[in-house]
Amino acid sequence: MPNATLLNMEGKEVGKLALNDAVFGIEPSKSAMHTVVVSYLGNQRQGTQSALTRAEVRGGGIKPWRQKGTGRARQGSTRSPQWTGGGVVFAPKPRSYRTSVNKKIKQLAMRSALSAKLADNEMLFLDNITVETVKTKTIAEMLKNLNVTEKALIVLSENNEQVYLSARNIPGVGVSYVGMVNVYELLKYKKVIMVKDAAEKLGEVYA
């Protein structure tokens, strides 16, 4: 069972955190992570893109000029794809991009993402994050104390409105919590700052 250094908001070590090896110490599956991320991004799409084909564009029923004798290229319609105002070749139509991924692959992808972040030293563990009043400065100073300058995702054990409101104005910083955090978020951000309770919950849920 891997041990991680536990820090406080001042960036000082306050102890060690025992992590579940089945969640934070596996060989990452790139194919599982890829499958889940592609599915997640596809599910975010509205799928409302639409354009008219040559058959659907209004007009263009008459031949613009005779077939031979003009010296110009032969044309049958002013709504052919090469014409301005013409139809679109293989025009996109509204459709659903949703794909489903089975539970086993989703769980493997989450364990893989957590293990990859830990193996690459891109994960920090805090004993707790406390914000008494909504203040961006509190989170900004915490990041400074932790020497985090890259994009960072803060993972809490449960939804905390004060932490979210305090962090939302800092560019490149996201906030999530157990039950909402996903593989795409973990891979999108360079650093993951996770509180102790969240790590323990994830260790139980995905074991």
Would you name each region that the model predicts?
Residues R54-F90:
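Glycine/serine-rich anion-binding loops at beta->alpha junctions
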Residues A4, N8, A18, Y40, ...:
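Exposed boundary/loop context
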Residues M1-Q46, A91-A207:
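Extended polybasic, low-complexity segments that bind anionic RNA or targeting/receptor surfaces
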Residues Q44-Q49, Q67, Q75, Q82, ...:
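Residue-identity detector for glutamine
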Residues A32-K68:
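A short, flexible low-complexity segment enriched in Lys/Arg and Gly/Pro that occurs
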